Amino acid sequence: METKEQERNWHLVRNDNGEWISDKNVVFLTKQEARSLQIKARFSGKTLSLQHGYDGDLWCYKHEMDYINQKLIVMNNISLLEPGLLDAGHSLYQLLKGDLAPSWWTPLTKDHELYIEIRKKNVIDVYYYGGRMAEISYDRFSDGVVAKAHPKYLGYTDVKDENYYRRSVGKGGKEQFTPIYQDCQNWLESRVEELKENIRNIYSQSENGENTTEKFIQGKLITEGRDKYLDSEFAHRFHDQAKETIRIDMVKIENNHIIFEELKRIGDSRLLTYNGEPEILRQIRHYREFLQGNKDRLAAYYKVLYRIKKELGLPVPPVDDVDSLTVDPEPQLLIANTYKKDTEDRKKRIDDIERILSSANINYRIDNFV
């Protein structure tokens, strides 16, 4: 009986009145998050019942946080996705169709090691396992297609070379070097494999057993799941008056739902902490707020993106009726288990991660990736 009671206590928290509350109905907060939420509560006109845990932890009731966040969305505190970010009739897409397309374009679309993404303001990015091989855009002065690449992928890795990097001085007098992107059409024409090799050399540790990078895993998932994934690296500002940016790793389509999926490696420190709340909980909360406030706008955006990709002959998930696509406001978390050996500490880490994610009602799954 004592063991069962102890196990049960792991799923209960005590409020300031001494009452026991299920941890599924509460949200744990850092001191900074608590202060921020108190400010939001004042703006929204909602009283926040901030509670103090036995070990000094701060928490609030989930329904109070949900109300505050929803009220702030209504008040346009959450940045809204503006319309017109994509134009299916844009000159770039017209110039990449049929005989008008540069000779290097079609081979890129058929290269199974590459994946091609449509970006806001009608820019196209070409990726090779974590490296952005090329940025393709329309040049209105020449009325043509331009393709540029980071100089390091073209072999120019010396950041002090003023032909390829722009020097500036940042805070504290620290030197900064900004790459000057270079035309890479000749490389795309006849030196694609060399370009890939340069990227592999720069990311030599990308595929390295348990230390395989998140970007490599992401690229592998996309290139092997073209019937599921529609987009990657979606980014947008979170608040209109703040610099914080929402960045969600992958966007997929399942059962006519557009689903936003965050990717983490099992060893990522943001998944677990024994001193306060893991960062992943705050991250997922922000995703929820953003998706809830923008679900209709995101659906409209991705319907256009889907049609652009399909018209360009790029792989897209099968959809019977594009107009019926809807956005799932609940983000998903995919954890790549790169552990090759099981140890007691690793098993405990996984158990602790799952317990925290489950108690926070996060939709997650853990897949082996070795």
List each language-model region with its residue ranges.
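Charged, terminal alpha-helix-loop-beta segments
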Residues: 1-370
